[in-house]
Amino acid sequence: MVKQRDTLTSLSQGSAHEAGRSNETDQQREANRALVAQVHEALFTGHDVSVLDSGFSPDFIEHSPLVKDGLAGLRQLVSDCPDMRHEAVRVLADGDLVAIHGRFTGLAETPLVGFDIYRVAHGRIIEHWDGLVPEAPPNVSGHTQLDGTIGPGEGDAEANRIFITRFFTETLIGGDYSGFRRYTDGTNFIQHSPDIGDGVDAVIAFLDDLAAQGNRLEYQRIHRTVAEGGFVLTHSEGSISGRRHAYFELWRVVDGRLVEMWDAIPEVPQDHEALHDHGIF
């Protein structure tokens, strides 16, 4: 009886410890989300460059092909773009990464939509990647690049990350587009890409047509993922017609099935052609 009581006590203490760690992780994730959302808004909409000192690490690493190195590059960007504004639509937090899906105006003649990924360390932003493309009209199914489901929901982020990584490896890196049937319900798929309509048939036909024209979307590797609830953002590298591209693709999973996606797929320079020495990925 004593041994049984000791075992139960040990299990109880272990469960409490795990719950404490989980709560601590949740708190850190929410702190990172709040930091990035506040700093991003203050800098790119409010043009408050003081956040470069309060919210960024002095050793900040910039990977964006649009910005020169470090904090000086961000300061110059804000100075050069007095009409710049940003509308955040989705903000995902996962460990030390926070991803923002939204729309920039004032950076170019046409609004730009896409993704920013930030890495946070010790309460400061330490690293940043982005992928932005020109805003396009709604696709043939009436969806824009930003509308649709907003919140991540209550899904199992780690299970969904594994699911999407497996789908991505088989279907996009491996080029077996029938994966869109295996990982969805086989028919339904909500599409926010400007060039493709809804449905599994539409996305497979689009990818097959590109391949037949010699313009296959080539995927080489996933560099990072940001998963929260039913959302998984993949940041990957590849090429189209021999030109290097970054693939930012946001997937939504419901009950173990792929149901919706958004993307931004900009052409990017080779690392030695970038405005900095940190590489694009």
Regions found by a protein language model. Give the residues of each.
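C-terminal and inter-domain tail/linker signature
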Residues: 2-281
